[in-house]
């Protein structure tokens, strides 16, 4: 069973994934959307941060790549 801190860490990472997916979808619809670009860049900074590395063992660059591939296929 996961402890509450692991649950919180997982929830933080999952929310960032949802936010990144949303930003990529908005960029696909309208590439000039500055708010979506800003949101995507903020998520990428998080995925490359030390805080992200403290929350999960999933490689941030790998996650970014997979989410971009997913967005292209939609």
List each model region and its residues.
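Short, charge-rich amphipathic interface segments used for partner binding and complex assembly
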Residues: 34-72
């Amino acid at each position: 069973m996961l402890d509450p801190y692991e649950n919180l860490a997982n929830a933080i990472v999952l929310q960032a994934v949802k936010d990144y997916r949303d930003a990529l979808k908005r960029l696909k619809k309208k590439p000039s959307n500055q708010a979506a670009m800003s949101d995507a860049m903020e998520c990428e900074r998080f995925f490359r941060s030390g805080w992200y590395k403290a929350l999960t063992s999933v490689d941030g660059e790998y996650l970014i790549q997979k989410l971009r591939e997913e967005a292209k296929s939609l």
